């Protein structure tokens, strides 16, 4: 018998996370590793599991995440976005609280490109008057 799965895709910075929710005990697996082994900072892990707290579904689903691109912060944000979208497929009534908390909004902030004539995106070489 096929197991019930709920899917969602999340994005943040240059990261894309494909999230699957499976009814279970609340175990989170990112790229085949436990989330505590994969992400180095505790605040990223708590940030990542916020949608479950908002919808009061903590410990109801196992999370399987396939994420690539970006760094740890972007990957955690993409996973959070994906979990929120997947929870919408579980129950459409979650839309109100998730939207109010800003979980469904794709964060548009991206790395600004480097401009020629400058050292970085906005950093210029020191100005000399004489």
From Swiss-Prot:
Compositional bias ranges of the Basic residues kind: 111-130
According to UniProt, the name of this protein is: Small ribosomal subunit protein uS9
The molecular function terms in GO held by this entry are:
RNA binding; structural constituent of ribosome
**According to its record, what are the GO cellular component terms?**
cytosolic small ribosomal subunit
Looking up Pfam families in the UniProt record yields:
Ribosomal_S9
Can you name the source organism? Lacticaseibacillus paracasei (strain ATCC 334 / BCRC 17002 / CCUG 31169 / CIP 107868 / KCTC 3260 / NRRL B-441) (Lactobacillus paracasei)
Q: What PANTHER family does the record point to? A: RIBOSOMAL PROTEIN S9, SMALL RIBOSOMAL SUBUNIT PROTEIN US9M
GO terms (BP aspect):
translation
The protein's matches in NCBIfam families, at most eight in alphabetical order, are given as: PRK00132.1
Keyword Ribonucleoprotein listed: yes
On whether Ribosomal protein is a keyword of this UniProt record, the answer is yes
List the residue ranges of the region (Disordered): 98-130
Report the leader peptide range: none
Q: Give the family, as the similarity comment puts it.
A: Belongs to the universal ribosomal protein uS9 family.
Give UniProt keywords alphabetically.
Ribonucleoprotein, Ribosomal protein
Record's superkingdom? Bacteria
């Amino acid at each position: 018998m096929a197991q019930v799965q709920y899917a969602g895709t999340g994005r943040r910075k240059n990261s894309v996370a494909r999230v699957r929710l499976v009814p279970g005990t609340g175990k989170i697996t990112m790229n085949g590793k436990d989330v505590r082994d994969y992400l180095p900072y505790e605040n990223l892990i708590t940030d990542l599991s916020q949608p479950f707290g908002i919808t009061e579904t903590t410990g109801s689903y196992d999370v399987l995440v396939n994420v690539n691109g970006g760094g740890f912060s972007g990957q955690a944000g993409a996973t959070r976005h994906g979990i929120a979208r997947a929870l919408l497929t579980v129950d459409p009534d979650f839309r109100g609280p998730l939207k109010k908390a800003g979980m469904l909004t794709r964060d548009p902030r991206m790395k600004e490109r480097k401009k020629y004539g400058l050292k970085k995106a906005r950093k210029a070489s020191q100005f000399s008057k004489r």
